[in-house]
UniProtKB/Swiss-Prot annotation:
<dbReference type="InterPro" id="IPR016181">
    <property type="entry name" value="Acyl_CoA_acyltransferase"/>
</dbReference>
<keyword id="KW-0012">Acyltransferase</keyword>
<keyword id="KW-0808">Transferase</keyword>
<dbReference type="InterPro" id="IPR004616">
    <property type="entry name" value="Leu/Phe-tRNA_Trfase"/>
</dbReference>
<dbReference type="GO" id="GO:0008914">
    <property type="term" value="F:leucyl-tRNA--protein transferase activity"/>
</dbReference>
<comment type="function">
    <text>Functions in the N-end rule pathway of protein degradation where it conjugates Leu, Phe and, less efficiently, Met from aminoacyl-tRNAs to the N-termini of proteins containing an N-terminal arginine or lysine.</text>
</comment>
<comment type="similarity">
    <text>Belongs to the L/F-transferase family.</text>
</comment>
<dbReference type="GO" id="GO:0005737">
    <property type="term" value="C:cytoplasm"/>
</dbReference>
<protein>
    <recommendedName>
        <fullName>Leucyl/phenylalanyl-tRNA--protein transferase</fullName>
        <ecNumber>2.3.2.6</ecNumber>
    </recommendedName>
</protein>
<dbReference type="Pfam" id="PF03588">
    <property type="entry name" value="Leu_Phe_trans"/>
</dbReference>
<dbReference type="GO" id="GO:0030163">
    <property type="term" value="P:protein catabolic process"/>
</dbReference>
<dbReference type="InterPro" id="IPR042203">
    <property type="entry name" value="Leu/Phe-tRNA_Trfase_C"/>
</dbReference>
<keyword id="KW-0963">Cytoplasm</keyword>
Length: 191
């Protein structure tokens, strides 16, 4: 199947995101409230995670095994990442828009975060772990990277209890779109 990458990026740039429904039909979604991971002093994480970070058990990489991160994110009992969406992520990766931010323990993929980068916006699509704390360490290290690279926003799309522990917060759609417009003008790059 042919996909128009420019149209897909335009959809994300307008504040929408792709998801498959229970019948694997792909569609564009938006929400009245959007969840952001703070890139300032509001970002936080549990003290127990600081101990894990201090142990330096994990190393981080970008796009070392993009396909494995997509597969890890999609490998759930119920998933919104259909085969079609996995193919779109692969094409976005090949064209420089999709990234995997990974944690590794030795030669084993421990966890990762799948995201789309447009300007200074990191749009987090999904995350997973194979080794406990793998995705949490990825979150902390990704926020550090986004700060270093002067990103404007880390869009997590929808709130969940896991994200709340990192200081995630909701903003209204109008405020989100204003911030997104600013992010799109930023020359930030992940690599």
């Amino acid at each position: 199947m042919q996909y128009d990458i420019a149209s897909i990026i335009q959809g994300y740039a307008q504040g929408y995101f792709l998801m498959a429904d229970d019948n694997d039909c792909l569609g564009w979604y938006g929400s009245r409230d959007r969840t952001l991971i703070p890139l300032d002093e509001r970002f936080r994480y549990p003290k127990s995670l600081q101990r894990v970070l201090n142990q330096e058990r994990f190393t981080v990489a970008i796009n070392r095994d993009f396909a494995a991160v997509v597969a890890g994110c999609a490998n759930r009992e119920s998933t919104w990442i259909s085969q079609e969406l996995q193919e779109i992520y692969r094409l976005l990766y090949q064209t420089g828009y999709a990234y995997s931010f990974e944690t590794w323990q030795g030669e084993e993929l421990a966890g990762g975060i799948l995201g789309i980068v447009i300007g200074g916006a990191f749009i987090g699509e999904s995350m997973f772990y194979r080794i406990p704390e793998g995705s949490k360490v990825a979150m902390v290290k990704l926020v550090e990277r986004l700060r270093q690279r002067e990103f404007v926003m880390f869009d997590a799309q929808m709130m969940n209890p896991h994200l709340e522990r990192f200081g995630a917060y909701r903003i209204k759609d109008k405020e989100y779109k204003t911030l997104l417009e600013k992010a799109l003008l930023s020359p930030s790059t992940l690599i």
